[in-house]
Amino acid sequence: MTEPAFFPETATSTAEPRLVVEPGVAARVAAIAEPVLEGLGYRLVRIKISGEAGCTVQIMAERPDGTMLIDDCEAVSKALSPVMDVADPIQRAYRLEISSPGIDRPLVRQSDFERYTGHLVKIEMAAPHEGRKRFRGTLQGIEDNLVRITRDDAKSHEGAQPADARLPLADIASAHLVLTDQLIAESMRRGRDAEREQLENAGVLPPPPPHAKKAREMRDKAGPRKEKTAKKPLPKNTKAHRLAADAKRRQTTSDPHQGE
């Protein structure tokens, strides 16, 4: 199995702080896991501890580009398991689970809100903003530490365009992407690019030519592709169609000796 490559050029990206902080035992696990992940070139996304069917400690991680392959999960598990055994943050038996953020992933860093501009999100505020705590809409990026979304659940006034909301980044309690066809297609493309890059780094595939690498970078910066709208079929039962059909019927039923 191919070993995932270390990403030395992304050390700054891995050090970007998260906007969420887990409470209690999850916070202790995060304090142990985060340095190990950063040392391998990954970023911590979220810690979740559940007691169903025994205790499970789920550590959600990612590469700085937002992807996470199976080989990456295995590498993190192999490096983190002995560290967790020594630190022993949980005073009972547990199962360690390393996973990717998933397609409808949580947004936990400022760069997440920038990377997924153009996608549908759900946001919950720590305190009410403009009389409400929950928002849903299309992410429009960040400006002056305010997350901008175009809401799809409200209108500024009847007959107008959907209302915009500007939410303070520091007041966001949780945020995650909403599963759409557009998001699925984008995630699959990112996954294919990550797998190809892994094989290129391992020497299994030849490196891409400079123009192909540049095109890939420009495509990532461009954000999600706009869905193509199918052209509506032309109507086939208009007045012109009916008149033409009627004239054709009159020609076929007319007397062939007429005019002689």
UniProtKB/Swiss-Prot annotation:
GO terms for biological process: ribosomal small subunit assembly; translation. Required for maturation of 30S ribosomal subunits. Residues 189-199, 215-227 have a biased composition (Basic and acidic residues). It comes from the Bacteria. Residues 228-242 have a biased composition (Basic residues). Keywords: Cytoplasm, Ribosome biogenesis. Signal peptide: none annotated. This is Ribosome maturation factor RimP. The keyword Cytoplasm applies. Pfam families: DUF150_C, RimP_N. It is found in: Cytoplasm. Belongs to the RimP family. GO terms for cellular component: cytosol. Residues 189-260 are annotated as: Disordered.
